[in-house]
UniProtKB/Swiss-Prot annotation:
It holds the Pfam family MutS_II. This is DNA mismatch repair protein MutS. GO terms for molecular function: ATP binding; ATP-dependent DNA damage sensor activity; damaged DNA binding; mismatched DNA binding. GO terms for cellular component: cytosol. Belongs to the DNA mismatch repair MutS family. SUPFAM superfamilies: DNA repair protein MutS, domain I (SSF55271), DNA repair protein MutS, domain II (SSF53150), DNA repair protein MutS, domain III (SSF48334), P-loop containing nucleoside triphosphate hydrolases (SSF52540). SMART domains: MUTSac, MUTSd. PANTHER family: DNA MISMATCH REPAIR PROTEIN MSH1, MITOCHONDRIAL (PTHR11361:SF34), DNA MISMATCH REPAIR PROTEIN MUTS FAMILY MEMBER (PTHR11361). ATP binds at residues 622-629. GO terms for biological process: mismatch repair. Keywords: ATP-binding, DNA damage, DNA repair, DNA-binding, Nucleotide-binding. It comes from Geobacter metallireducens (strain ATCC 53774 / DSM 7210 / GS-15). It comes from the Bacteria. The keyword Transport does not apply.
Length: 872
């Protein structure tokens, strides 16, 4: 250590306090990285890795660096790679410091704590989430978006429900107790853990006394109950870990975290991880894209905060009928008033992301352009309020009352900040003329400088008679008078020599020196004063953060309502009836996304009736590609849309509010967790049977297909019986299957109905009619579907042959079908039932073929039938 330079010793001391972060160490105009940080960062950032001496034992020290004024994109790239970055600044002026400059970490940027807009997706939250297992079956979940100040907590029962909240929040970073490090990956969902940064917090942070003290101190309350968080012990422990982490990384600059909202999952329609994925609520299954999801369809929002609010509504549909109807009323009024919708959109399109502007202003990381954007946004509010004054629905009226134009804030910014300020704060040009008297005076001095120099130069030329005399400036000598050597004899006595050149000499005069001190001092003072004034304005705006947050939330809500109204009007959706009953009735329902994407083909609508009586469980049979999965997803999506307050794609709908939607649709191996397709399927089915209630909606597609036929039929049959017979989980259920044996359940169970997807056979082809009709399907048409998929003709013909053998019902020991392995017999071209007689029955055949059936009387027909009977 003694061989290290003082600077490297300082670096290593600071680095020791931040071992899990890449340390950006400020050296002049650069952030430097050393040792392992340099090696890692140079690889991620694709920048040059170099080295220099004076490391331990005299070894070379790997290093790389980036300019401090353009560090943001480099930091963003490291964060995107899952790294944390500790920003270490010089906290002393090198000009006035002897020895090593004092440095300290001013903040740590982590994947879950990003505030720079360039690194954030506009219409998605960037959550830091905290999980805490109370070891009593209850899990605390808390999550924060530092860029907006949104901070929420809840408690759930069990591991699966906790990870369901993780799936909903979709955090970039997850905090867990350090003692949970070893089993975090095993206990967690592999697919949910992928791509997220895990941070392990010291166990003592979760101590309940410390938790309560931290919560009370931050929010300035006497007890957590003042925040509405009574009865959330584990949730508060999770939230305290977030606050502790903020203190460690943000160095206390989190004043904009002013509210902690507790919620019960029972207040919303519960959607587990599998259901969110299978229904493609916010991203498609195949590509993970927004387009093709329900969010992609419904999002017509004009603001980023509106887009985030819509995502929240989709993730948390309502279960309280009055609140749903309140939203429906507002959507209906907007849908029926195109002029009002257009006016709202025009106003909102000029509104910036107020939530994130508020966050940056409160964190003192905003620039002058952020304040100008805030002013422009606030100026859009008065005309918007004029539009809303005439609205008649309760929710729109509440929004109108709650949106604050904050006139004095807009006036302060307009008076204090120029309309087009520079990006860099410390270069001046930010504060408007007329805002501050001293600044105006200093600017006058600076602006008059050129005129003063020109006048002084003319005066000196006249006084000395030296026509070639020049007054110039450089950074080393400041202002000076330059005289050629041929004119040195004409210089006055008050000229003071400053520099001798080959062909000239440079001088100053007392008058020029006095001007220099005044002008240069003025320019330095201008920059210093402007920055100070800007900070004062920013602090004044930050003090109104709560008002701004409330206004932003109401504008976001208005934006979502207008977006839903746009879609409802354009796509001819209906307002569904909502009640607390048990009936789910949809007339001519359509799949919202499929209908919108396939504009060239008319979507075939379908009806559905489910209740807790004789229509509790509907078994749906029919071939692949016929539309079973689309139909079932469409029912689930219509229910979800109705409960988030949207209109729905149907001619009429009545929705008895459901408490949960479960889907078991499709499957794939989860290699990260060592689980097969069948295991994933069975785990999801088990979760449904454990958690479903009579108020739930269950969608099951092809239960049991991941194992042998007999096992699959048995499991599917037993699951259907359980959902029917067990009162605790007798949910309204759509059950699609290829096992036609299950249609027999409608005979033995009073609340089971059979439906199938209609098809039409024509010229050995199958035509899918996409219509759900009563009754079970008679065929699966799998071979026809295989032909449509392009399987080789040899495979198709062999499949027909095997199917023919299987339909004979021949099985070997153990239930395995007997399939001929010898020379292939040609697959029959027609069903064997079409030939009623053997070829040797010539007399019988001749008698039948000679009959003119159309000419027979009933009596003649009976006599001939008796004759034929005697011939057999």
């Amino acid at each position: 250590m003694s061989e290290l330079t003082p600077m490297m010793r300082q670096y290593l001391e600071i680095k020791a306090d931040h071992p899990d972060s890449i340390l950006f160490f400020r050296l002049g105009d650069f952030y430097e990285m050393f040792l392992d940080d340099a090696v890692k960062a140079s690889r991620i950032l694709d920048i040059t890795l170099t080295s220099r001496g004076k490391g331990g034992d005299g070894a070379d020290v790997p290093l790389c660096g980036v300019p401090y004024h353009s560090a943001a994109p480099y930091i963003a790239k490291l964060i995107e790679a899952g790294e944390k970055v500790a920003i270490c600044e010089q906290v002393e002026d090198p000009k006035t410091t002897k020895g090593i400059v004092k440095r300290q970490v001013v903040k740590v940027v982590t994947p879950g704590l990003v505030v720079e807009s360039e690194s954030l997706s506009p219409k998605e939250n960037n959550f830091l989430l905290s999980l805490f297992d109370g070891n009593n079956g209850r899990w605390g979940v808390a999550y924060l978006d530092i860029s907006t100040g949104e901070f929420r907590l809840t408690e759930v029962e069990g591991h699966d429900a906790a990870w369901g909240e993780v799936a909903c929040a979709n955090p970039r970073e997850i905090l867990v107790p350090a003692s949970f490090r070893e089993n975090m990956r095993g206990e967690g969902r592999g697919d949910l853990a992928a791509g997220r940064t895990f941070t392990y917090v010291d166990d003592w942070v979760y101590d309940r006394d410390y938790t309560e003290r931290l919560i009370k101190n931050h929010f300035g309350v006497a007890s957590p109950g003042a925040l509405g968080c009574d009865g959330y012990a584990e949730g508060l422990q999770a939230a305290a870990a977030v606050l502790h982490y903020l203190q460690e990384t943000q160095k206390g600059r989190v004043d904009h975290i002013r509210e902690l909202r507790a919620y019960r999952t029972q207040e919303f329609l519960v959607l587990d991880e599998a259901t969110r994925r299978n229904l493609e609520l916010t991203a498609t299954l195949s590509e993970g894209k927004r387009r093709g999801s329900l969010l992609g369809l419904l999002d017509r929002t004009a603001t980023a905060m509106g887009g985030r609010k819509l995502r929240q509504w989709i993730n948390y549909p309502l279960v309280i009928v009055e609140k749903i109807k309140e939203r429906q009323d507002a959507v209906g009024e907007l849908a029926n008033d195109p002029a009002l919708r257009a006016g709202i959109r025009e106003a909102l399109e000029g509104v910036y992301d107020l939530e994130r502007l508020n966050g940056r202003i409160s964190l003192a990381s905003s620039g002058a352009k952020d304040l100008v954007a805030l002013k422009a946004s606030l100026q859009r509010i008065p005309p918007l309020l004029s539009l809303l004054e005439s609205t008649g629905t309760a929710l729109l009226g509440e929004l109108c009352k709650g949106i604050d134009p904050m006139d004095e804030v807009a006036e302060l910014i307009g008076r204090g900040i120029v309309d087009d300020p520079p990006f860099v704060l410390r270069e001046g040009g930010i504060i408007a003329d007329g805002y501050h008297a001293e600044l105006d005076e200093l600017r006058a001095i600076s602006r008059e400088g050129k005129g003063f120099i020109a006048r002084l130069e003319a005066k000196e030329k006249a006084r000395t008679g030296i026509t070639s005399l020049k007054i110039r400036y450089n950074k080393v000598f400041g202002y000076y008078i330059e005289v050629t050597k041929t004119n040195l004899g004409s210089i006055p006595e008050d000229y003071i020599r400053r520099q001798t050149l080959a062909n000239a000499e440079r001088f100053i005069t007392p008058e020029l020196k006095e001007y220099e001190e005044k002008v240069l001092g003025a320019e330095e003072r201008i920059v210093e004063l402007e920055y100070s004034l800007f900070q004062q304005i920013r602090q004044s705006v930050a003090a109104e953060g709560e008002r701004l947050a409330r206004t932003a939330d109401r504008l976001a809500t208005l934006d979502v309502l207008a977006s839903l109204a746009d879609v409802a009007h354009e796509r001819n959706y209906c307002r569904p009836g909502i009640d607390d009953g048990d009936t789910l009735s949809i007339s001519e329902g359509r799949h919202p996304v499929v209908e919108a994407l396939n504009v060239s083909e008319r979507f075939v609508p379908n009806d559905v009736l489910l209740d807790n009586g004789e229509n509790q469980l509907v078994i749906i049979t029919g071939p692949n590609m016929a539309g079973k999965s689309t139909f079932m997803r469409q029912v689930a999506l219509i229910v979800l849309m109705a409960q988030l307050g949207s209109f729905v794609p149907a001619t009429e709908a009545r929705i008895g509010v459901v408490d949960r939607i479960f889907t078991r649709v499709g499957a794939s191996d989860n290699l990260a967790r060592g689980q097969s397709t069948f295991m994933v399927e069975m785990m999801e089915t088990a979760a449904i049977l454990r958690n479903a209630t009579p108020k739930s909606l269950v969608v099951l597609d092809e239960i049991g297909r991941g194992t042998s036929t007999f096992d699959g039929v048995s499991i599917a049959w037993a699951v259907a019986e359980y959902l029917h017979d067990t009162a605790r989980c007798a949910a309204k259920t759509l059950f699609a299957t290829h096992y036609h044996e299950l249609t027999e359940l409608a005979v033995t169970r009073g609340k089971i109905k059979n439906c199938n997807v209609a098809v039409k056979e024509w010229n050995d082809q199958v035509i899918f009619l996409r219509k759900i009709v009563e009754g079970g399907a008679s065929h699966s048409y799998g071979i026809q579907v295989a032909r449509l998929a392009g399987l080789p003709i040899e495979v198709i013909e062999r499949a027909k042959e095997i199917l023919h053998n299987l339909e004979k019902g021949e099985y070997v020991e153990g239930g395995v079908p007997r399939i001929s392995r010898g020379k292939r017999a040609a697959a029959p071209k027609s069903s064997p039932q079409l030939s009623l007689f053997e070829q040797g029955d010539d007399l019988l055949r001749q008698r039948l073929t000679g009959l003119n059936i159309a000419a027979l009387t009933p009596l003649e027909a009976l006599n001939i039938l008796d004759e034929l009977k005697r011939m057999v």
